[in-house]
């Protein structure tokens, strides 16, 4: 018999469906797997006017946010009210695991100021690219970097998803230790009929008997799109 205590874990993320990105998918995978047989996981994420949380068989706690009407569909978390911090404390979590070093990590920082709960931060993406590209003034960029770094430094453990992400951590000023913790997302296995394949090919004018490469992700250079294009060009030149 396994006598180990099953933990109650907060899975913090700034993005969750209907907003879809890599972090959103990882947060779903964590919640599904933990709730299946490892313990209890509750997703902590900003409110979204298009949320359909009834579709999930685990608890999702939504906190106040500001909605940005954009193609990405992101909400900006606003975790500043004391009652929001008390809500997390009242849930009696054993661990706070943030997958976003911005609003939700700051939320967890405020909670820990009132009640000490172990925290883990997984650093997924290269925020310096987004800051440098989207934040218009140096003063605002400096504030964004300080905010990001303070949230990272506040965690008891910092995880990265690959060795390559460590360079980004160092660029934003983090000098502490880290753990490389690879992750992945389970995808359902489906059987697609020959008729369905033929229909899709006709719809998108895809010729038969040629290799098909599909990229799913944000159209931004640091996602290695240039590498993909160069590789495709090399294959074309080689016939």
Labelled PLM ranges:
Residues 1-64, 88-89:
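N-terminal subdomain of nucleotide-sugar transferases
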Residues 27, 34, 213, 228-229:
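A structural motif in glycosyltransferase catalytic domains
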Residues 118-120, 128-150, 196:
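Nucleotide-sugar donor phosphate/pyrophosphate-binding loop at the beta->alpha transition
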Residues 182-191:
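Short beta-strand->alpha-helix junction loop in the catalytic core
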């Amino acid at each position: 018999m396994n006598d180990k205590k099953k933990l109650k874990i907060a899975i913090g993320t700034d993005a969750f469906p209907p907003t879809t990105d890599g972090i959103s998918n990882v947060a779903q995978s964590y919640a599904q797997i933990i709730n299946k047989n490892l313990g209890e996981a509750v997703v902590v994420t900003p409110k979204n006017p298009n949320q359909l949380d009834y579709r999930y068989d685990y608890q999702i706690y939504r906190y106040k946010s500001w909605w940005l009407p954009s193609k990405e569909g992101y909400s900006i978390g606003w975790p500043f009210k004391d009652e929001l911090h008390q809500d997390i404390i009242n849930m009696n979590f054993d661990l706070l695991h943030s997958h976003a070093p911005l609003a939700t990590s700051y939320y967890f920082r405020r909670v820990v100021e009132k009640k000490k709960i172990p925290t883990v931060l997984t650093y997924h993406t290269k925020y310096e690219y987004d800051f440098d590209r989207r934040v218009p003034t140096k003063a605002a960029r400096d504030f964004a970097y300080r905010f990001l770094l303070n949230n990272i430094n506040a965690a008891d453990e910092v995880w990265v998803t690959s060795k390559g992400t460590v360079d980004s951590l160092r660029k934003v000023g983090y000098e502490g230790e880290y753990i490389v913790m690879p992750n992945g997302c389970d995808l359902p296995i489906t059987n697609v009929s020959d008729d369905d394949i033929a229909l899709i090919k006709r719809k998108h004018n895809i010729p038969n008997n040629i290799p098909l490469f599909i990229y799913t992700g944000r159209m931004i250079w640091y996602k290695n799109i240039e590498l993909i294009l160069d590789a495709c060009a090399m294959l074309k030149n080689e016939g």
